């Protein structure tokens, strides 16, 4: 029995022993056992407190659910509803205002187009003073922009943009081309290329025409010079008649025979030509070969008349110089021309 009572005392707390009023101090073994058993008791108390808190929160949730159910209950139409948050009402009003603003913005471009159609002049173009002030928009950096009705809304033309380029004016006709030119003018190349495509075409054509004119002029001068060579026998004959008026008839006929023939268009030299067959040669050696092969030297007879006649034939009618060969005389006559 004594052992059973000791175990019961050890299981009971110190408060029970103090309540009995015995006032006897506890033994150290019993006190150690009580200290070991104390955490279990405190944990049990904490579990009780947690259960009480959970029950309180459940009760609070129930009250909130009841409040929400009361708010969701339908009410009579004449009877005002319960206090609802005013934020929802303000949000719906704001959405309604934004929708109305968007509808106004969608209707506004049509009105602007109607105004522009009314302001158009009979030719279908807007004058610079007829543009309404609503078309002028000021941007943030101070530049003024104009919204044209024909262009889309995204494109805006600046009021300070560069003016359109004027079509190029036709250049004045040259006085050289006014005399014999067509109605279209020399600067229009069969309707394909105009002066706008090729600048300075009129000046170029005038320069080319003048160049061709001077070429023709020099060519005509060259032709006249060649004609002077071709028609040279008559002036040379007159010159011989003036210089030697006292010469006899055989000398005049001989000088006429020694004059150079008509030159070809190749411009061969007048010194290398044959007086007998009227052939011209480029080189003097060719003329010598021709004279030796075709025109052999004639043996002069003892007749003095024939010798005198030969001397008269081979004498220069200008300076009266005598030559042994006929081609020498012809070369000398070329120096007098």
From Swiss-Prot:
Where is the region Disordered? 1-32, 55-83, 146-179
Any one GO MF term held by the record is: zinc ion binding
Q: Which UniProt keywords apply?
A: DNA-binding, Metal-binding, Neurogenesis, Nucleus, Repeat, Repressor, Transcription, Transcription regulation, Zinc, Zinc-finger
Q: Where is this motif: Nuclear localization signal?
A: 295-302
Please give the InterPro entries that the UniProt record associates with this protein. Answer: TR-Histone_Methyltrans, Znf_C2H2_type
Its induction, per UniProt?
Up-regulated by OLIG1.
A GO-annotated cellular component: nucleus
Q: Which GO terms describe its biological process?
A: negative regulation of DNA-templated transcription; oligodendrocyte development; positive regulation of myelination; positive regulation of oligodendrocyte differentiation
State whether keyword Ribosomal protein applies: no
Tell me where on the tree of life, at the top rank, the source sits.
Eukaryota
Alphabetized Gene3D superfamilies for the sequence: Classic Zinc Finger
What family, per the record?
Answer: Belongs to the krueppel C2H2-type zinc-finger protein family.
Q: What does this protein do?
A: Transcriptional repressor. Plays a role in oligodendrocyte differentiation, together with OLIG2. Mediates Notch signaling-activated formation of oligodendrocyte precursors. Promotes differentiation of adult neural stem progenitor cells (NSPCs) into mature oligodendrocytes and contributes to remyelination following nerve injury.
Question: What assembly does the database describe for this protein?
Answer: Interacts with OLIG2.
What's the protein here called? Zinc finger protein 488
């Amino acid at each position: 029995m004594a052992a059973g009572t000791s175990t019961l005392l050890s299981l009971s707390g110190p408060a029970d022993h103090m309540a009995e009023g015995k006032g006897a101090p506890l033994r150290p073994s019993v006190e150690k056992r009580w200290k070991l058993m104390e955490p279990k008791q405190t944990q049990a108390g904490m579990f009780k407190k947690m259960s009480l808190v959970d029950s309180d929160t459940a009760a609070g949730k129930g009250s909130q659910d009841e409040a929400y159910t009361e708010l969701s209950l339908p009410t009579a139409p004449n009877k005002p509803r319960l206090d609802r948050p005013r934020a929802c009402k303000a949000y719906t009003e704001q959405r309604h205002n934004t929708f109305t603003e968007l509808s106004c913005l969608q209707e506004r471009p049509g009105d602007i187009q109607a105004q522009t159609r009314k302001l158009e002049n009979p030719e279908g173009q807007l004058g610079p003073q007829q543009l309404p002030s609503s078309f002028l928009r000021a941007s943030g950096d101070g530049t003024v922009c104009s919204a044209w009705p024909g262009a889309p809304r995204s494109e805006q033309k600046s009021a300070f943009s560069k003016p359109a380029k004027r079509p190029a004016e036709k250049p004045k006709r040259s006085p050289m081309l006014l005399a014999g030119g067509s109605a279209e003018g020399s600067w229009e190349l069969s309707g394909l290329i105009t002066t706008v495509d090729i600048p300075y075409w009129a000046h170029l054509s005038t320069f080319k025409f003048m160049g061709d004119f001077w070429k023709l002029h020099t060519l005509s001068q060259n032709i006249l010079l060649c004609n002077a060579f071709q028609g040279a026998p008559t002036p040379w004959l007159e010159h011989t008649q003036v210089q030697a008026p006292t010469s006899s008839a055989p000398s005049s006929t001989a000088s006429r025979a020694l004059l150079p023939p008509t030159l070809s268009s190749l411009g061969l030299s007048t010194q290398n030509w044959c007086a007998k067959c009227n052939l011209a040669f480029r080189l003097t050696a060719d003329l010598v070969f021709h004279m030796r092969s075709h025109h052999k030297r004639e043996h002069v007879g003892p007749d003095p008349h024939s010798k005198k006649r030969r001397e008269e034939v081979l004498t220069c009618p200008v300076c009266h110089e005598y030559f042994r060969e006929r081609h020498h005389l012809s070369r000398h006559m070329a120096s007098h021309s």
